[in-house]
């Protein structure tokens, strides 16, 4: 009888715990979508994991960026438990999303949280170059973003800037030494990307930069030494 009572109490405690967790799960994501910062903060203080994913695999921070829910973004970024590098199903990190949207202040905050500037596949620099976010591109490069990073199909930031970004974005990448000769899996260079969308001025700019590099005098060592 005693064992039966103990087992019953144990099952009740477990059931109550699961119910509480389910309630917190729903409350958290409802608060995130509604930009209810106080509710999110309260849940975190009670031990809710900010890195929990919803039924679609999205974290609270990713959802807050999408909505957007700016107050909740601040709460989550300020939480030491938040992993700012967790990506969505498309392998997009919070830094990538902030970069393509031109959210400079958020990019700065994420970098202060040690958000990864470089990663396998598409990178924040690809995204910033795509939308011509010059200031963010400079910040990423200053934080050692790999300028010739390749996406899964071999596309570089210069290629994305050539097709979708601004001429200033292309100019910046060229000035910083982006490789003009690289090709993606289809054998296309940055010039090909520009020509594909009839951006002849951009194609000419890249071609001129490549020619200038090819004709640049080679460094000569002094007295036989570098």
What are these regions (language model features)?
Residues 30-35, 63-69, 97-103, 127-133, ...:
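Ankyrin repeat A-helix N-terminal signature
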């Amino acid at each position: 009888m005693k064992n039966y009572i103990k087992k019953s109490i144990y099952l009740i405690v477990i059931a109550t715990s699961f119910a509480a967790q389910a309630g917190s799960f729903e409350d958290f994501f409802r608060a995130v979508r509604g930009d209810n910062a106080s509710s999110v903060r309260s849940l975190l203080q009670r031990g809710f994991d900010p890195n929990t994913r919803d039924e679609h695999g999205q974290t609270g921070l990713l959802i807050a960026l999408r909505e957007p829910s700016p107050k909740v973004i601040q709460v989550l970024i300020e939480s030491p438990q938040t992993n700012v590098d967790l990506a969505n199903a498309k392998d997009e990190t919070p830094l990538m999303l902030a970069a393509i949207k031109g959210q400079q202040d958020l990019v700065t905050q994420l970098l202060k949280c040690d958000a990864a500037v470089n990663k396998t596949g598409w990178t924040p620099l690809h995204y910033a170059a795509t939308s011509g976010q010059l200031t963010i591109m400079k910040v990423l490069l200053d934080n050692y973003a790999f300028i010739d990073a390749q996406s899964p199909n071999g596309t570089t930031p210069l290629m994305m800037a050539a097709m979708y970004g601004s001429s200033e974005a292309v100019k910046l990448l060229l000035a910083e030494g982006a490789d003009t000769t690289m090709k993606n899996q289809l054998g296309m260079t940055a010039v090909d990307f520009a020509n594909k969308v009839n951006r002849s001025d951009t194609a000419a700019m890249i071609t001129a930069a490549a020619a200038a590099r090819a004709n640049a005098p080679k460094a000569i060592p002094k007295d036989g030494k570098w």
